[in-house]
């Protein structure tokens, strides 16, 4: 049987294809070995994962102080004049300084409280790094005509303990200030006009931050004077919220200015008093 040209071309083609396939297989095998070698060399330069993890675990702890209490800003307290002096600062107020320096100031105080003898004036401790200036009384401010009072009475015979009370009212934005009582300003930092204040309902009516760890009281009183803040209805709502928070968290009971139980009807009556006061003030200005 003779093999023709066609058959020879087929045989040669098969041999060529087989050679190409063999050469490709050989090259592929060699490239895998080189790739593995490169990977081995690359990973050999990386730090050991276990050592890195151990370093993280054994490294120095990083403490995040998430609870920083704002500093006092005694800016513009015309009706509560007192000679400031340098005093001891509580640890909680010292931690607050850095955070509160960035807070914007929001307005001027428009609250004159020359009333109750319960709130006797005296020198105050101002936790401020800058030298304090003597606060002078603004004689142009009108006298307080009405005072809205909400008292919180402790149900416990031991009363409200100083540290817990301080923590609670700081969370509500009150800051220690003039006359050694607490004030709620427009800003949580203690800047801007005073919205309302809180005093110790037990004589002499003040708080001693230097001895707050041993302090306790059976009752505190929140009060808002009229004329006072520019937006008295909103300020009153903030005061109600602060009083309710204290009563809820420290087991207290809300009382009105007659020491009767504070009800929703009483709160609405207070709001109506504010509306009536604003109406009278508007009428007087127009007259």
Swiss-Prot record:
Membrane-protein topology: Single-pass type I membrane protein
UniProt-listed GO biological process terms: division septum assembly; FtsZ-dependent cytokinesis
Subcellular location: Cell inner membrane
Periplasmic side: 1
Cytoplasmic topological domain residue ranges: 23-287
Keyword tags: Cell cycle, Cell division, Cell inner membrane, Cell membrane, Membrane, Transmembrane, Transmembrane helix
Basic and acidic residues: compositionally biased ranges: 64-77, 85-104, 121-140
Cellular component per GO, a single term: plasma membrane
Pfam family of the protein (one): ZipA_C
Annotated region described as Disordered, given as residue ranges: 48-140
Highest taxon listed in the record's lineage: Bacteria
Major location category of this protein: membrane
Transmembrane intervals: 2-22
Family: Belongs to the ZipA family.
Record's subunit section: Interacts with FtsZ via their C-terminal domains.
PANTHER family the record matches: CELL DIVISION PROTEIN ZIPA (PTHR38685:SF1)
Role, per record: Essential cell division protein that stabilizes the FtsZ protofilaments by cross-linking them and that serves as a cytoplasmic membrane anchor for the Z ring. Also required for the recruitment to the septal ring of downstream cell division proteins.
Protein name: Cell division protein ZipA
Organism of provenance: Pseudomonas syringae pv. syringae (strain B728a)
